[in-house]
Curated annotation (Swiss-Prot):
Protein name: Palmitoyltransferase SWF1
Organism per entry: Yarrowia lipolytica (strain CLIB 122 / E 150) (Yeast)
Source superkingdom: Eukaryota
A single BP term in Gene Ontology: protein targeting to membrane
Family: Belongs to the DHHC palmitoyltransferase family. SWF1 subfamily.
Lumenal topological segments: 1-4, 86-107, 223-257
Record field: catalytic activity: L-cysteinyl-[protein] + hexadecanoyl-CoA = S-hexadecanoyl-L-cysteinyl-[protein] + CoA
Task of the protein: Palmitoyltransferase that targets several endosomal SNAREs. Palmitoylates the SNAREs at cysteine residues close to the cytoplasmic end of their transmembrane domain. May have a role in the cellular quality control of transmembrane domain-containing proteins.
Cellular component terms per the entry's GO annotation: endoplasmic reticulum; endoplasmic reticulum membrane; Golgi apparatus
Record's bilayer topology term: Multi-pass membrane protein
DHHC domain boundaries: 157-207
Amino acid sequence: MWLKIYLLSILAISVFTFVFLFGALPQFEDTAVWKFRKWLSNRPAAIRSWDSKYCGGRLSVVGDFCGSVVAPAAPWSVPILYCAFTTYMFSAYYEDLHPFIAENHWYYAWLAPVAYTILVVSFVLATFSDPGKITKQNHALLLNQFRFDNLMFLEDTECSTCKFTKPARSKHDRFTNKCVAKFDHYCLWINNTVGLYNYRWFLFFLLGNVWTLCWGALLAGLKMIVMVAAEYKDHPKPLPSIFSQWWQVMITNENKRVGIIFLLSVSTGALACAFTAMHFYYIYLGATTNETDKWGDIHAAISEGSVWMFQKPGFKLDRSILLQKDEEGRPNRSLTAEEREYVAQNGLALTLLTDHKPIVNIYDKGFLNNLKAVMFPNSAY
């Protein structure tokens, strides 16, 4: 019974995680995944609206109060939960799997200590390293770290909280209340922002989890094969399906821990692999998670027919100069002096943009260079 509840819970968590991770990608635009993510994102506002209409905002007041009480400890609850989960997995491995592996597959015995070391080191680095906090001391240097593309990041935009000009690709993180250079996202699992300086450690952390969960599934699977073979050695034919054989072995009391290790490793390992692949895809695109969301907004505006771009047939652009017009044809901004000079020198004309492909991402330097920039960020200190 509990195993079925666990499997259903994992399935539900996997669906919601997939929707939130990938639903904003341009490839899913106007699909059921994209629409479901948008619907979920609007639920908090819808609940507050319902509360305001029918309960006079009382539920929101209670919720805000409860949030203020648990807020100081809440950020660390997920990392603590992660550490507890990891500790349980390794203790279960050494009690139920390691003797079998050491006796029958000794060449795999080194995997556990190596994986545990990688997890601990990567978790500490990702959790406690500086993501690229922008301060008065390093602001001038970080301001010149990246060019302004005037698409997602406009010049002379001030952070309303920190009261200084926002460097390109930066964002004020509302969870940690600080501006972060090359902001990617805030990660609950490490209770830290992922940015310019610690993105490499975050990747290290992801790869460490992928490594651990994959070998966990492999080693638990090796023992499951032996247990299933022993259980059905003298079983009358025809034998049940492979799935039924594995399921029956996993739900017996003496095999439950091995079954749990296998199921946890496979289910969470699939999510870890998908999440890691997504981040390498972002590196390939030359974009952060935050910027991918912004690109989604640009694609939506193009679909609405409100985006115009300076271009010329046959001319290869090295930057994109875009304007968004309202219903009355008024542009959202004025061109900078540098943009006006670029348009005049190359004889570019303002035309309606019907496809996102002509847009140049100035931050994309090719996959290898993008990866190099992630692994070896230029220090601003």
